[in-house]
């Protein structure tokens, strides 16, 4: 399980 990372540009 990978941590969900949301990158906002």
From Swiss-Prot:
Keyword terms: Amidation, Neuropeptide, Secreted
Single biological process term from Gene Ontology: neuropeptide signaling pathway
Main localization (coarse): secreted
Compartment(s) of residence: Secreted
Protein's UniProt keywords contain Amino-acid biosynthesis: no
Sites bearing Phenylalanine amide, chain numbering: 9
Oxidoreductase listed as a keyword: no
Any one GO cellular component localisation term in the record: extracellular region
Name the record gives this protein: FMRFamide-like neuropeptide FLP4
Source species of the chain: Penaeus monodon (Giant tiger prawn)
């Amino acid at each position: 399980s990978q941590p969900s990372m949301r990158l906002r540009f």
